[in-house]
């Protein structure tokens, strides 16, 4: 074990991680990671300003953001590059991002401080718990799930976040007309997503052919996607609209 003391922000993040009961099957794995100076700055200075704690009560996001605005919920923002790009391009939209990887949380928070953005709030915990407990039903305009872990091995498929229960939870939280936008670079997972969502009640596939949509302009291209394109790899986008 390290003898390095934790920062106050790390203590705050750890408190709610330890206080919550664990779900039986997680769609993610907690990874240890070293903090850069910028990421630590983000946690120390950005968490008190932009960080939110998991609660058992539905949150008033109008009060939290200080306005009424279209609301986007992002599951697993990684290092936050896409979130920053989307938030900067759409200052009239409020973003709620959730990520369990602390260096990624620190990186996004540092970016918010550096760019002076105020339309993003951040959770560092299980996104499904945030949806269940903190987000009001029929309150989200969009939910983004970009490049989730595909859990390639068959015995791990139960860990995939996109399951019938996930589809129903998201449907409840989206407004009628709200959209679930997913993207993956693993074709078998894309087919799995399509199968699950096509069978889920209350949704309409926005793809003209009933399968995948062309890459939407509003989704930033990641460095991994650019590398994949050079190698001839594909990316599949799915958009399902809540209709009921």
From Swiss-Prot:
Signal peptide: none annotated. SUPFAM superfamilies: S-adenosyl-L-methionine-dependent methyltransferases. Its EC number is 2.1.1.33. InterPro entries: SAM-dependent_MTases_sf, tRNA_(Gua-N-7)_MeTrfase_Trmb, tRNA_methyltr_TrmB_bact. The active site is at 149. Substrate binds at residues 153, 185, 222-225. This is tRNA (guanine-N(7)-)-methyltransferase. One of its GO terms (biological process) is RNA (guanine-N7)-methylation. One of its GO terms (cellular component) is tRNA methyltransferase complex. The keyword Ribonucleoprotein does not apply. Residues 1-10 have a biased composition (Polar residues). Residues 1-20 are annotated as: Disordered. GO terms for molecular function: tRNA (guanine(46)-N7)-methyltransferase activity. Catalyzes the formation of N(7)-methylguanine at position 46 (m7G46) in tRNA. It catalyses: guanosine(46) in tRNA + S-adenosyl-L-methionine = N(7)-methylguanosine(46) in tRNA + S-adenosyl-L-homocysteine. PANTHER family: 3-DEOXY-D-MANNO-OCTULOSONIC-ACID TRANSFERASE/TRNA GUANINE-N 7 - -METHYLTRANSFERASE (PTHR23417), PENTACOTRIPEPTIDE-REPEAT REGION OF PRORP DOMAIN-CONTAINING PROTEIN (PTHR23417:SF14). It is an enzyme of class 2 (transferase). Keywords: Methyltransferase, S-adenosyl-L-methionine, Transferase, tRNA processing.
